[in-house]
Amino acid sequence: MVDIHSTAIIEDGAIIEDGVKIGPYCIVGKDVVIKKGTVLQSHVVVEGITEIGENNTIYSFVSIGKDNQDLKYKGEPTKTIIGNNNSIREFVTIHRGTDDRWETRIGNGNLIMAYVHVAHDVIIGDDCIFSNNVTLAGHVVIDSHAIIGGLTPIHQFTRIGSYSMIGGASAVSQDVCPFVLAAGNTVVLRGLNIVGLRRRGFSDEEISNLKKAYRILFRQGLQLKDALEELEKDFSEDKNVKYLVDFIKSSDRGIAR
């Protein structure tokens, strides 16, 4: 059973699955799919080619799937894809992709607090937290389990690694490595995110290896190339250190230090 308020506008062609609740004055466009258990509170607008997964809660005055703000965008049939079990709070804006990636994508279990902006072609993993007024510019990639403090803008094409935590009112213009704490304008590294790693169930051995890797990368004065070679040699069997090394090697914007 679908629960749709009498004042909501659902255009012909929209696919609304059982268990969806759509509140007062919502607008759902003709190319939208909303899967079971998702709740749209009041005044939510969902347009464009948009798919919203199961059991999401979308609060008042959220806008999803509208045309992006890229001046090169000419109305291409790009998409917005949202997974399951996300909480999207008041006044969040999530724009559709461009012909670069063809989609903006959000994973599962994320908390996106009020007034966050998710621009075109952004990719967000799972179980991330975005505090109020975070701004993700176009093409930003946020790996799973990251936490971004409030009022933080992130430059286009920047990547944020898993299990990292960025302090509030920071400004991010380079990639932020996984597993670290970072803060400042512009952002600098403040150490390993040890409390966060413990809360996520990392073992003492895993944390110890990441501490050693952090020291080799950022505290011993080595050239980055030499530090990476040392990590590959000494931690070849450690999946977390391998992810860290691969992250740095794949960086296009350079890494924050």
UniProtKB/Swiss-Prot annotation:
It holds the Pfam family Acetyltransf_11. It is found in: Cytoplasm. Pathway: Glycolipid biosynthesis; lipid IV(A) biosynthesis; lipid IV(A) from (3R)-3-hydroxytetradecanoyl-[acyl-carrier-protein] and UDP-N-acetyl-alpha-D-glucosamine: step 1/6. GO terms for biological process: lipid A biosynthetic process. It catalyses: a (3R)-hydroxyacyl-[ACP] + UDP-N-acetyl-alpha-D-glucosamine = a UDP-3-O-[(3R)-3-hydroxyacyl]-N-acetyl-alpha-D-glucosamine + holo-[ACP]. GO terms for cellular component: cytoplasm; membrane. Its EC number is 2.3.1.129. Its main location: cytoplasm. GO terms for molecular function: acyl-[acyl-carrier-protein]-UDP-N-acetylglucosamine O-acyltransferase activity. HAMAP family: LpxA. Belongs to the transferase hexapeptide repeat family. LpxA subfamily. Homotrimer. NCBIfam families: lipid_A_lpxA, PRK05289.1. Involved in the biosynthesis of lipid A, a phosphorylated glycolipid that anchors the lipopolysaccharide to the outer membrane of the cell. This is Acyl-[acyl-carrier-protein]--UDP-N-acetylglucosamine O-acyltransferase.
